[in-house]
Structures are given as structure tokens and as C-alpha cells.
């Protein structure tokens, strides 16, 4: 028995007598106990003898405790354990285990970065910052950029092309969301003809273990998403990404043929698959006309919109404006205007930035659109009227390439059943 060292006290499961000194020893002991708790017929001969020799030097951990410990390990460790055997993979792909893993992962979210380069897309993750100290990023996934829409898991490096949408219409727009009640991921797809309204709506449920397939749903609210030009893939690019908050997917849409000004916000209840909309507030901008473009964000659990605040008749920043939805039924919004402190005001004016979102403490987070000699995040605290710059290390090879940052990334290990036809 190994004494002292790292203790799993944070689990509330082991006393000091189970302390271990090395993560590799922990992983190996879990492997041994996983093998002892489940019968693996393919492990025979010399493999079994080797395992028995190691078992003599280790104490048995109850199987329930082994599973509990596994939920606290990195995704790469889970991927390694899945390869031990078919039965082991079945156990770790079980919905109870994957849901427990996702719940724990959600309590310790990370930062996620993506960088497209030379026809490939690279994903990096990093711990969330506690101060202005530099953060190291870790490469998780590298994959080819393809023309078909797909869902990818940056944690495991897996990706799944979506099945072909059954439609004769030429324009297709999709959004991705999560239902926390039924614990299901869904893709909402809307199709339209070149000059028509988005009249077809289809949903794909992801992660149920069943074959991926589209099914049509009813929409009684005439609308279409606010999209602009086409990407190289041939798909229209939404002016704003959709955002999912507490089981509701929000995206900008033209409701009832309203073509004037800033579009309304469409709401899609992922569980019940019902549509509604929230009227825009007076003063919301569709396009700021400057480097910093408007963005839908999650602000302390509420749908909100960030935009550059520009003075009348000017194209220069006077600050940042935050719109927060207070009452969806009454379409009531609150507006907050923040004047940035110098010299940050000038730096933000001169650098092409994008809004990343707001942190759980209410800080407004921005990042450069492209990686230069350094890459960083800016955290603006409205209460202190101060900006903290957090350097991100490990992305130097992507200088001059586009970058995208995401807050509150939770690792997930759900595996869908592949489609038969793509």
C-alpha cells in the first residue's frame, strides 16, 4: 500500500490510508480493479498472470467506488479504459455513467479555443483563470475541415457527420442545443427556397444510442434566421451564432416578414420543440459598423446581447452596451452602458476583437479575432471599471490565423450511434 501523497479527499470517498503518490499509479489501480470487478474473457494467459501478480500488491477498491473515481478522471483516461475490452467500453458508454461524468465536468468548466489552419481545425482547452497569470493551452483535437455539417467532440477527438437533410430546398441553417431535463442534445435545422420563407423545420436528437435521423416538426410562427453570405462549404453563415440557455435555444430571426432594422430573437424550447419570439429593444443594432460586432450571450443565466456603444453621428467607441432580457412575456429589456477606461478604450478601437461572452461573475470577455505575436483574453469588470488581460500560451504556431474562444466548456463522453447513410 502506498502511503501519503495525493489524497482523493475531494471525492469524499477515500480516507488517508488510500492516499496515492502518482496519477499513473491511480490509473493503473483503477484498471486492475475494473478488470477484477468485470469478467473479461479475452484477457487470458500471460495477461491474466501479469494482472494476478499486480493484484497481490494492491487492495481491492469496491466497483461502485471505481466507477465514481472514473467520473473524476480526464477524458483521455476514460478513452483508454474504454479500449480494455468490449464489456468495459459498454460500461463506460452507459448513459448513467456518461451523465454522471457530464454533471461533474459541468461543475469545473474550462476555456475552449479553436483555430483553423491549412484546411484543418485545431481545438485547445485551458483552465479558467483565477487572476491575470498566463494560462497554458493544451491541444485536444486536430481534424480536417470538410464541407458537410458535423458534430465534433473536442475532448475525445471524435466527430460525426450529420445525416443528409431530406429536402428539395436550397438553403439550410442549423443550430445546436441541449435539453437538461431529458439530458438530450438536439440539432434544429431550417430549410428554405432561395426567395422563400424558412418553411421546413427538422430536428435530430443526438446521444440517445439510436441511429441519427431527421424528423420534421411543426412551426406555427412564420420566420427565418438572420443569415448573410455563403461560406465556402455552400451553407449560409448566420449573422449571429445561436446560444442555448437552460434548455432554450435563442437565435436572431425575421418574424412575420419583418425586414426592418435589428431582427427579433426566436426562442426554441428544446424539450417541447415549440417556437416563440422576443421583440427587439429600441436601440439594438444589427451591425455596429466597427470592428466589434454585436453578439448574443448568456449573462448570469439570462439571454443578453453585447454591442459596441457608439456616439451619435460617430463611428468611434464610447463604450460597451449590454442588453439583458428581464421579462420574456412582456418583451422587457434592461440596458447598461459602460465607458471603458483609458488606455484600453484606444486599444480596443485599434484591434479587431470579438465578444466571447460574460463570465459567471459578470465580467465581459473579449478576444482578438486573429492570433498575432500573442493571444489573450480581456476581462472587463463593470463594477471596478477595470480590464484584466490574460495571456494564452501554446498557440504561437497559429500566428495570423483566426481564433475563436468559448467560455464554460464542459467535457462530455456521449457517443451517438452512427448513421447508415450520409
UniProtKB/Swiss-Prot annotation:
> What positions does the domain F-box occupy?
56-103
Q: What is this protein called?
A: Putative F-box protein At1g20657
Q: Which domain of life is it from?
A: Eukaryota
| Coiled-coil region(s) | none
What is the species listed in this Swiss-Prot or TrEMBL entry? Arabidopsis thaliana
Q: Which PANTHER family does its entry note?
A: BNAA05G37150D PROTEIN-RELATED, F-BOX ASSOCIATED UBIQUITINATION EFFECTOR FAMILY PROTEIN-RELATED
- Name the InterPro entries on file: F-box-assoc_dom_typ3 (IPR013187), F-box-assoc_interact_dom (IPR017451), F-box-like_dom_sf (IPR036047), F-box_dom (IPR001810)
